[in-house]
Amino acid sequence: MGDGGVDVRLMLPGKPDHWYADCVAESYFGELIKHGVKVYRYTPGFLHGKSIMVDREAAFVGSANMDYRSFELDYECGVMVYSAPMIESLLEDMDMIVDHSRLVTKEEWAKRSVLRRVFEPLLRLFAIWM
């Protein structure tokens, strides 16, 4: 459980489409893991859809990243879902993704390459545009 007893899971592609965006995302793993977030890498490959579920009562599904670029510059879309059957279906999809993913451990994250460690803070400067 994350801080406050909340079950937070972050599922990311095992094979990212842009190495530099992945490097920025990965730079936050240590802090997320420290606060109890479970970070997963989807091993079959790429994930692009975004979904958020809150207490099995509401969900967001769409293409939009939760960032400045998606909300201000790009034309992304998503829907809020309040239907119990749709939320249960989404939960089944999320569980399937977790079943086909590997959990990123604090130890694994700490062993990332020196090159990534050098690039992370530099690329974070440009994160708002990625």
Feature-to-residue mapping (PLM):
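PLD/PLD-like phosphodiesterase catalytic module centered on the HKD motif
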Residues: 1-130
